[in-house]
Amino acid sequence: MSLSILMVGNSLTAANAMPTMLAKLLDAQIVAITRGGARLAEFSNPLTKTGSRVLQALDGDGTQAGHGCFVIAQDMSHLPATNPSAHERAVAKMCELARDHNAAPVLYGTWGYREGSAKLKKLGMSAAQMGQLMHEGSLRAAAAHGAIFADMAKAVAQMEDADWFYAADGVHPSPAGSQFVAQTIAVALRR
């Protein structure tokens, strides 16, 4: 395997074993460090359990060595839309950490929630509004810090019918949705 990848994120990353799907698409070795509900800021903070695990992975398992190493980072499901400045700070720290370990940083930007979902109603915005804010917040953070950008918000917003993409909760991806996420990330890495 020529690629080694560290993926960090929450249940949107872990759902349906998406890192395994991506590993198969890229013929890569992927170490996934996930925690449900986690914010990206945790993963670059060595004082947190997840941050400590990230440092161990970068320092100790070979993910930092060799050609074609990536750190793929995913933030809390709504943070780019609801607190873009906190999102950008977290992306900046993760990009710095990746580069300190000779890895290319990749931002896996997530999507807006499905129209009518309970979590979207709680945020008080439409699916289109959330999708646009997710796209803008993540694009801005990736561009400001030189990260490769896998833009799932834009990809999902452009679907004529995105119902197949979502699990029943309207937030997480379905198995087919996770496969689409893996394919979109793979395309971004191959550019």
Residue ranges of model-derived segments:
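Short beta-strand elements of ligand-binding domains
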Residues: 106-109
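Conserved beta-strand segments of alpha/beta enzyme cores
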Residues: 29-31, 104, 146-148
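Tryptophan-centric aromatic hotspots in well-structured domains and transmembrane helices
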Residues: 68, 111-113, 185
